[in-house]
Structure formats: structure tokens, C-alpha cells
Amino acid sequence: MSLAAVPHLTAGLQTFLAFDFGLQRTGVATGNVLTRTATPQATIAATGDARLKAIELRIREWQPDALVVGIPFHPDGASHENTRRAQKFSRQLRARFGLKVFEVDERYSTTEALAGGAADADAASACIILEQFLRSLP
């Protein structure tokens, strides 16, 4: 479902924190509706509760209105194990922090980040995910 078709879901939301979830590292980016751009932040190199504590610090620092999580799919759109892991991560964020969490198809974000010469592919992927989300807003 396109966010343009349901503008009430994002009404009043201005700032976002986005995540490119990985088993060992999670890319992070910040962005806003006004500029519709994203800025990479330091990648979180932690798992489990340590990852969530690091995210909590980022949320306190940036005070986003909502979160965005990239969800990986196979090129044909089929889900796989990492799809389910990222969706679980998304649910954990929603439950733990009480913020709206939007899921974005992140196919090819890492490939695009690497092709762009990103020094931190995870953070660059989070930027790509967030900018894709921001462009989809009405």
C-alpha cells in the first residue's frame, strides 16, 4: 500500500530515524519531511539487547516522530529468513519505544550504497531506505 494513498498515517510526522537491520550491524540514518533527505549516522555494531540500548540512545538524541525499517526481499519479491528477522526487529522497536514504525522494501539498497562508494554501506543503505520512504510521502 502506498503512503500517498493513506496520508493520515504520516500526518504530523516530521522527523524520522531509519534502520538497515543486519545480524551483526545496523545502519542508521536521520531525515525529515521538510528536506526529504537523509543523513547517515554511525552504524550500530551490536546485537540483541545491546543493539536495542544503542537504538534507545539514538532515539533520545534525535527525538524522531517515527521510525523506518528496511525489509529485505528476494529480487522476485519473495520473503526469506532475513525478511522475517527484519520484520521481527520492526515489531520489537514498535513495542519497546511506542513509536510508529514504517517498513520499506529495501531491495538493492546495499548494492546501491556500495556502487556509490559508501565508506559505511550500512549507514548509506539506511539513508537510501529513508529517502525512498520520504519520497513516497504525499
Curated annotation (Swiss-Prot):
Keywords assigned: Cytoplasm, Hydrolase, Nuclease, Ribosome biogenesis
A Pfam match is RuvX
Q: Name one GO biological process term.
A: rRNA 5'-end processing
Example GO CC term: the record gives: cytosol
Q: Which SUPFAM superfamilies match?
A: Ribonuclease H-like (SSF53098)
Q: Which GO terms describe its molecular function?
A: nuclease activity
Instruction: Report the EC code(s) recorded for this entry.
Output: 3.1.-.-
Question: Where, subcellularly, is it found?
Answer: Cytoplasm
- Disulfide-bonded cysteine pairs: these are none
> Where is the major localization of this protein?
cytoplasm
Question: Which HAMAP family does UniProt cross-reference here?
Answer: Nuclease_YqgF
Q: Which family does it belong to?
A: Belongs to the YqgF nuclease family.
Summarizing the function annotation, the protein's role is: Could be a nuclease involved in processing of the 5'-end of pre-16S rRNA.
PANTHER family on file: POLYNUCLEOTIDYL TRANSFERASE, RIBONUCLEASE H-LIKE SUPERFAMILY PROTEIN (PTHR33317:SF4)
Protein name, per record: Putative pre-16S rRNA nuclease
